Design a protein with these regions (language model features):
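Interfacial transmembrane-helix boundary/kink motif in multi-pass membrane proteins
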Residues: 2-20, 67-101, 277-299
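Alpha-helical transmembrane segments in multi-pass membrane proteins
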Residues: 21-65, 249-257
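Functionally important transmembrane alpha-helices
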Residues: 23-29, 184-249, 267-268
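Juxtamembrane helix-loop-helix connectors linking adjacent transmembrane helices
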Residues: 32-42, 72-146, 304-314
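Residue-level signature of the transmembrane alpha-helical core
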Residues: 91, 136-137, 141, 145, ...
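Function-critical hydrophobic alpha-helical transmembrane segments in multi-pass membrane proteins
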Residues: 121-181, 185
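Alpha-helical transmembrane segments of multi-pass integral membrane proteins
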Residues: 246-261, 289-313
């Protein structure tokens, strides 16, 4: 019965996410802001994920005598995890970023060779410290915190009595389905699978929050400010000819395959034989509320500074 209630809570959240994302968030942007900006992104993240996650964590099961919390989030201190496991898990996260980047790049290069039309998902922008800081907070750190609490923490607790494949696949599929199109969905699905595997093997929610944040930061840096070698953007900016593009395609395929093999090896190694005792965190301290207030305050201050120093910025 308890598992049914947990699943119902997650289903309700998924329905709420789509209602809020399709109706409330666009209205928020339309009537409160001139265009999409970091504050709108922040409020959208809070409305669709932050507040619902807080409500689910705070919900008490009234059918039990002591009215215990319905969801229980497992979390092991990072200090209790082996250093090699921590380093290898970080490496596996970076390898996944390389795999996704060069797999997409391979598809773009093949598309160009067949159609002679250039297409890239990345853009190189001029670096502004304030804008970069805002992107780190709103688009990297905040989603990592809220999404891991929900899609790894709460889903892990809900599916703990199912087999490992279901416990990994279902949360990753739901996590991916909430992204906009096929490329972000595929990226989110692979990331969700990796993070859930590492969460199951380590028992540390803090670890997967950090890994998710690192992955987001890599995406911001290499999709907006720096182009990796042999990618479509770097090739066409340098005026490469067709033979150079074919060479880049071979490199891109090789990097993708090598990264994929190394991911499997690193995940198999992470925390091998390690089975730390789980620590139950019932969120009695109001941690989520404090974090949301801090993020809102910081983002509001930075947004004001951004408008003052660069009035044309979003």
């Amino acid at each position: 019965m308890t598992d049914t209630k947990k699943k119902l809570g997650l289903v309700i959240h998924t329905v709420w996410f789509w209602i809020a994302w399709l109706f409330f968030v666009p209205l928020l942007v339309q009537y409160l802001f001139d265009s999409e900006n970091y504050i709108a992104d922040f409020l959208g993240e809070i409305i669709t994920i932050g507040l619902p996650a807080q409500l689910l964590i705070s919900y008490r099961d009234k059918s039990k005598e002591k009215k215990e919390y319905l969801y229980r989030i497992e979390d092991v201190s990072l200090k209790r995890l082996p250093h090699k496991g921590l380093m290898v898990s970080m490496l596996s996260c970076m390898l996944l970023f390389l795999f996704v980047t060069y797999a997409i790049n391979t598809a773009q290069l093949v598309y160009y060779l067949r159609t002679k039309e250039f297409y890239s998902f990345s853009t190189v922008e001029e670096f502004h410290l304030l804008g970069f800081t805002m992107a780190l907070i709103i688009n990297a750190l905040l989603p990592a915190l809220l999404e891991e609490i929900l899609y790894r923490g709460l889903y892990r607790d809900t599916f703990r009595n199912h087999n490992k494949f279901i416990a990994i696949f279902i949360p990753s599929l739901v996590f991916a389905s909430l992204h906009s199109n096929i490329i972000p969905m595929s990226n989110a699905f692979l990331l969700g699978m990796l993070l859930m595997i590492l969460y199951q093997r380590s028992g540390s929610l803090k670890l997967v929050i950090i890994l998710h944040a690192v992955y987001n930061i890599l995406g911001i840096i290499f999709n907006q400010y720096v182009s990796l070698p042999f990618t479509t953007l770097s090739l066409f900016n340098s005026g490469s000819n067709e033979s150079q593009i074919v060479y880049a395609l071979v490199i891109s395929i090789s990097v993708s395959l090598l990264s994929l093999v190394m991911i499997f090896l690193s995940v198999g190694y992470c925390f091998k034989g390690n089975n730390p005792a789980m620590k139950i965190n019932r969120n009695k301290s109001g941690f989520m509320d404090i974090i949301m207030i801090i993020f809102f305050f910081i983002s509001a201050v930075l947004m004001i500074l951004l408008k003052i120093t660069n009035p044309g910025a979003a």
